[in-house]
Amino acid sequence: MEKQILCFIILITCISCGLGLDSGLQNKQLKEPTYSPNYAWQLKLDGRRIGSQPYTEGQYFYLIEYLVGTRTVQLVKIDMETGVYVWKADQISDGEEWRSSNVVKADNKLYFMRPNSGLIYCYAENDGKLLARIQVGATEAEAIRNRCSLETIVTDGTALYWGSKGEPGTAPISGHLLKLDINTIDYTKHSTVQICVPHSLYTKGTRYECTFWSAPIIDGDTLYFNTYNRDHPNGYCSLVSIDLQSETVKWEKQLHGLQGRVNNDLIIKDNILYMLDVTALLRVDKHTGEVLTRYDDEKDPPYTQPLMIPTVSLCGIWYDGGRLYYTTVGSTETASQTGMSKDLVYSLVCIDAKTLKFLWGFHPVSGTSSTYPVVKDGKAYIVTHIDGLRVFDAKTGKLLGVDKSIIAWGDEANVLYKDYFIFFNTNFKTNRATLCAIRV
């Protein structure tokens, strides 16, 4: 099935679902078992999580908050043992409240990028002091071209890596997989913006061949990424492996029929690279790039297979015990919009990681989500958009319980820390979020 149109339609549907919290939807829902969370702590945030994912290391949680009612953001450090702020960095007011890259850590420093300006901010991990602001281009225009695509950067501890947006238009500029060595940064000049120009590890001749819509990942000394090529004249995207020591391409595969447009579509487990696209699911040998297993979505009706296509804005994929868990494009409107049977529509699925075959799924009650479930001791926990906190038997998919007092935007990444499932609970009226930890 060609779902590039479907993804857009369902995205609009999900937004409209979110606006109808009091529309009587609950009266249409079947009676479901209830779940009563055992809270370890709850922290009311100063604002809400911004459009970027948090970073965790040890017992600490690093988050960029959007301060409600302002155009201001701040980086914060939270103790996951106690649920209290450790520090709050100085606020940033640069005219863009929503978008930041994810937070990464190298040595004892934290980094994130503001894509609106092409600036990287660096902070001390121990106290949150600003150490540097770096413009990733010789000019502001070049920095904008070099900014990260889809707000994602990664690090191997010595450098920062990201896929750039390039530039559309009558004379389009191709995107690049960029590298910025952090030893080129002067950490004593925090009061002024310094210029550090990254260099390219990978590009193509035209923007149609090299645009980035998915997050790269690092495994050891190797970086993996795929390009976005929906408009590629030959209809394929490229899956690439780069050796970070030699900065050379280890292998590159042309994947015909794939678009490479899912935000966080890659995960590596046991030497296998999994790629989830809007048209196909792949299982790949990470050393050679050989496609070991491929599942292609149905292109035309009548549809007979379960809906297993991931949502475009996927936060990530959870792996547990030879299974992959993730959210799809499915919502309550999917059946009427596509002609699919409601029995085939799922907003959360569990598939066999070796065969890529469907094992179980959750039929959506209202809006879908782009987050992922966390699996602990045979149970899968997920905070959905409007459908509440839901707990499933991770093996069978049986719904064990629901707490509908917990709601979220559905696009937040969850965290498993020891025996704590940590998630965001949002008050839609105030747009304030509470970071919660429950014992699981």
Regions found by a protein language model. Name each.
Residues 21-52, 62, 74, 84-95, ...:
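Aromatic (tryptophan-biased) beta-strands that constitute blades/sheets of beta-rich domains
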Residues 47-58, 95-105, 140-155, 199-218, ...:
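Repeated scaffold domains used in trafficking and secretory/extracellular systems
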Residues 63, 112, 162, 225, ...:
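Residue position within the beta-strands of beta-propeller blades
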Residues 67-71, 116-119, 166-171, 229-234, ...:
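Short glycine/acidic-enriched loop and turn motifs that connect beta-strands
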Residues 73-76, 119-121, 175-178, 237-240, ...:
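A short loop-to-beta-strand structural motif that recurs across blades of beta-propeller domains
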Residues 79-82, 124-127, 181-185, 243-247, ...:
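Short loop/turn segments that connect beta-strands within beta-propeller blades
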Residues 326-349, 357, 361-391:
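Loop/turn-rich, solvent-exposed surfaces of beta-rich toroidal or solenoidal domains
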Residues 399, 403-440:
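Blade-level signature of beta-propeller repeat domains, shared across WD40, Kelch, NHL, RCC1
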